[in-house]
Every structure is written in structure tokens, then in C-alpha cells.
């Protein structure tokens, strides 16, 4: 699915917060990466973040 830059930032930020608070990491992370934002970006690039976006359909008048 294609996300806007704002949706992408929100997803990565929310997932990074979860990781920082102790949530389990879904992918195998290299030992040199310890920053939650970097881990969340890796998860986003691999399409494994367990967060979904519900987009409201546009209402035409």
C-alpha cells in the first residue's frame, strides 16, 4: 500500500515508541542498530509493522 509522507512518519513514530517501551521486535535486527526509530524504519521497509491505516473515503457533494 502506498502511504503519504505524513502517514509514513506517523506509523514509524508510533512503532518506534512501542519498541522503546519494550514491545518485541518483529524482524532480525543487526547488532549495530539499537535506535528504535531505525528498527521501526527497517520493519516498515520490510512491510512487517503491525499497524494499519484506515483511510476515509472522500465524500463528493
UniProtKB/Swiss-Prot annotation:
The keyword Transferase applies. Its EC number is 2.7.7.6. It is an enzyme of class 2 (transferase). It is found in: Cytoplasm. One of its GO terms (molecular function) is DNA-directed RNA polymerase activity. It comes from the Archaea. This is DNA-directed RNA polymerase subunit Rpo6. It comes from Thermoplasma acidophilum (strain ATCC 25905 / DSM 1728 / JCM 9062 / NBRC 15155 / AMRC-C165).
